């Protein structure tokens, strides 16, 4: 048995076309959706992510603004810039690219973003709203994974789901969204005693720890859906995920590749969240 591939590029293309239509409709009414992206320092990976986000905006009819600062930028100056963007009616979404330099408190920075412009969904108000089942914004990566389940008619109600990873960006919100969809959810992490005992019972496994080959074929229930959120490099320097793809694809029912799986969906859902923010602002 070879797993069906969940193609993030193809789904992303469809959803981006829908986002572009919504952006065009808003622009025609004088409310072009706008996203501001702030980059502090010269982290090469962050620079690539920011470039991809700005390009996605340009390709789909969004207004975008990129603020790039040296890593000597003070926390006070960054907070002042966020305050300006909070008050700018052309900007509907504000994204601060993480990680930030050590002298800047990322929690303080995220909390400074107006919740209605927090398109990453990381603000404590949005995290709390997600917990109570009424999210204003769903964090982009878990939201993208949910769209993948939906597109492939993968049943979530009553399913046993294991999320490997407990980060605020992926693991925790992923678990909340699965819970909201009616799955029975287990969160595993670095302190979990017997990871395989949990994953072998799972209909759905989401791997999001940033550790190569944390999930191997012998740990997967036949026919399970395996979502790989990891982003690592193998010994040859080639991009790979958290899952041993070559082995697991012969056991799983559905699987996402790396690259070309969850990655493209993250930026797509950022566009969708920005559109939703712009639509709310237009009707306010």
UniProtKB/Swiss-Prot annotation:
Keywords: Amino-acid biosynthesis, Histidine biosynthesis, Hydrolase, Methionine biosynthesis, Multifunctional enzyme, NADP, One-carbon metabolism, Oxidoreductase, Purine biosynthesis. GO terms for molecular function: methenyltetrahydrofolate cyclohydrolase activity; methylenetetrahydrofolate dehydrogenase (NADP+) activity. Catalyzes the oxidation of 5,10-methylenetetrahydrofolate to 5,10-methenyltetrahydrofolate and then the hydrolysis of 5,10-methenyltetrahydrofolate to 10-formyltetrahydrofolate. GO terms for cellular component: cytosol. InterPro entries: Aminoacid_DH-like_N_sf (IPR046346), NAD(P)-bd_dom_sf (IPR036291), THF_DH/CycHdrlase (IPR000672), THF_DH/CycHdrlase_cat_dom (IPR020630), THF_DH/CycHdrlase_CS (IPR020867), THF_DH/CycHdrlase_NAD-bd_dom (IPR020631). Homodimer. PANTHER family: C-1-TETRAHYDROFOLATE SYNTHASE, CYTOPLASMIC, C-1-TETRAHYDROFOLATE SYNTHASE, CYTOPLASMIC-RELATED. Pathway: One-carbon metabolism; tetrahydrofolate interconversion. This is Bifunctional protein FolD. Belongs to the tetrahydrofolate dehydrogenase/cyclohydrolase family. NADP(+) binds at residues 165-167, 190. The keyword NADP applies. It catalyses: (6R)-5,10-methylene-5,6,7,8-tetrahydrofolate + NADP(+) = (6R)-5,10-methenyltetrahydrofolate + NADPH; (6R)-5,10-methenyltetrahydrofolate + H2O = (6R)-10-formyltetrahydrofolate + H(+). HAMAP family: THF_DHG_CYH. It holds the Pfam family THF_DHG_CYH_C. GO terms for biological process: L-histidine biosynthetic process; methionine biosynthetic process; purine nucleotide biosynthetic process; tetrahydrofolate interconversion. NCBIfam families: PRK10792.1, PRK14186.1, PRK14189.1. SUPFAM superfamilies: Aminoacid dehydrogenase-like, N-terminal domain (SSF53223), NAD(P)-binding Rossmann-fold domains (SSF51735). Its EC number is 1.5.1.5, 3.5.4.9. It comes from Burkholderia vietnamiensis (strain G4 / LMG 22486).
